[in-house]
């Protein structure tokens, strides 16, 4: 699995976006399932895939890597798990297009958080992009007041915000392997689903 680290970032980003675009279709296919049931099912399969990835990648060092991530890994996992919840809730309360657009504003929040937290300068291009993104969100949220999807759009905003916070945590802990944070996010999400699901019967 070490070959993944050699793949250009933009290719991984495009592939991630492609996979994410199917999220709405999968979530909407469970018409009778509650938000927490969907979260539990989604997180369970996520955990299975991730455990396989970790074992193949780190082999006998898997447990050590998970421990070495420490509090930063747990905090990053908790923050990411909140994004998982927001994604499922948003997808069931507003359009897929709205959710995907709002998620795409993550770069805006990264620039803002980076400026205040990491003291990174914001270029003119980034500043203009932030203004355009904010304008788009304002128009979208304003329209949703009459369409009844305001709550879904508002929850969707938590996704790019939490992911940006996660990036800040990762940047602040460059000396740590933060892949375990993804593992912990799956654990948190499964726990949420187990506690809050009324039943474990799924209807597609």
Task: Give the residues covered by each predicted segment.
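Hydrophobic transmembrane alpha-helices of multi-pass small-molecule transport proteins
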Residues: 50, 54, 80, 122-142, ...
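Hydrophobic alpha-helical transmembrane segments of multi-pass integral membrane proteins
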Residues: 7-12, 37-56, 71, 129-132, ...
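Loop-to-transmembrane alpha-helix entry segments
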Residues: 67, 100-103, 119-139, 146-153
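Specific transmembrane alpha-helical segments of multi-pass solute transporters/efflux pumps
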Residues: 20, 58-97, 103, 111, ...
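Glycine-/small-residue-enriched transmembrane alpha-helix faces in small-molecule transporters
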Residues: 1-39, 78, 145-172, 191-192
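Specific alpha-helical transmembrane segments that line the substrate/conduction pathway
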Residues: 37-48, 88-119, 159
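Membrane-interface helix termini and inter-helical loops of multi-pass transporters
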Residues: 25-35, 61-63, 92, 98, ...
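Helix-loop interface residues and adjacent transmembrane-helix termini in multi-pass membrane transporters
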Residues: 32-33, 93, 119-121, 175-176
């Amino acid at each position: 699995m070490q070959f993944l680290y050699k793949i250009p970032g933009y290719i991984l980003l495009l592939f991630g976006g492609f996979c994410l675009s199917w999220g709405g279709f999968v979530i909407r296919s469970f018409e009778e399932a509650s938000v927490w049931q969907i979260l539990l099912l989604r997180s369970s399969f996520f955990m299975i895939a991730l455990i396989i990835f970790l074992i193949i990648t780190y082999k006998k060092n898997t447990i050590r890597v998970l421990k070495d991530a420490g509090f930063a890994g747990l905090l990053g996992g908790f923050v990411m798990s909140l994004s998982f919840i927001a994604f499922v809730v948003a997808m069931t309360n507003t359009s897929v297009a709205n959710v995907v657009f709002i998620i795409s504003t993550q770069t805006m929040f990264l620039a803002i958080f980076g400026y205040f937290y990491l003291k990174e300068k914001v270029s003119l291009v980034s500043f203009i992009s932030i203004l355009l993104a904010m304008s788009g969100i304002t128009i979208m949220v304003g329209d949703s007041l009459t369409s009844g999807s305001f709550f879904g759009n508002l929850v969707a905003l938590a996704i790019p915000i939490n992911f940006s916070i996660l990036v800040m945590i990762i940047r602040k802990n460059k000396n740590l392997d933060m892949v375990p944070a993804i593992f912990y996010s799956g654990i948190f999400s499964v726990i949420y689903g187990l506690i809050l699901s009324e039943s474990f019967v799924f209807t597609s």
